């Protein structure tokens, strides 16, 4: 799936939102802090959502 291979993008803003991204190198969904703007689609509000889309 294309979005699951996109890199983690924190973005330049400072909102400090806890999100999850799929790490295609390890095959796992991992937490990260998202700034709140200019991210990509490899950015999920929950671990469950990340695993559901990327099958981790």
UniProtKB/Swiss-Prot annotation:
It is found in: Secreted; Nematocyst. SMART domains: KU. This is PI-stichotoxin-Hcr2f. Negative results: does not bind to and, hence, probably does not inhibit serine proteases plasmin, kallikrein and thrombin. Has no or weak activity on hKv1.2/KCNA2 (IC(50)=52 uM), rKv1.4/KCNA4 and rKv1.5/KCNA5. The record marks 14-15 as: Reactive bond for trypsin. Keywords: Disulfide bond, Ion channel impairing toxin, Nematocyst, Potassium channel impairing toxin, Protease inhibitor, Secreted, Serine protease inhibitor, Toxin, Voltage-gated potassium channel impairing toxin. The keyword Secreted applies. Its main location: secreted. Residues 4-54 form the BPTI/Kunitz inhibitor domain. InterPro entries: Kunitz_BPTI, Kunitz_BPTI_sf, Prtase_inh_Kunz-CS, TFPI/VKTCI-like. Dual-function toxin that inhibits both serine proteases and voltage-gated potassium channels. Has potent activity on both trypsin (Ki=28 nM) and chymotrypsin (Kd=1.8 nM). Shows inhibitory activity against 4 of the 7 potassium channels tested (rKv1.1/KCNA1; IC(50)=142.6 nM, hKv1.3/KCNA3; IC(50)=40.7 nM, rKv1.6/KCNA6; IC(50)=154.9 nM and drosophila Shaker; IC(50)=433.1 nM). Has an anti-inflammatory effect in LPS-activated macrophages in vitro, specifically reducing release of TNF and IL6 but not nitric oxide and reducing expression of IL1B precursor. Disulfide bonds join 4-54, 13-37, 29-50. Belongs to the venom Kunitz-type family. Sea anemone type 2 potassium channel toxin subfamily. Contains 3 disulfide bonds. GO terms for molecular function: potassium channel regulator activity; serine-type endopeptidase inhibitor activity; toxin activity. GO terms for cellular component: extracellular space; nematocyst.
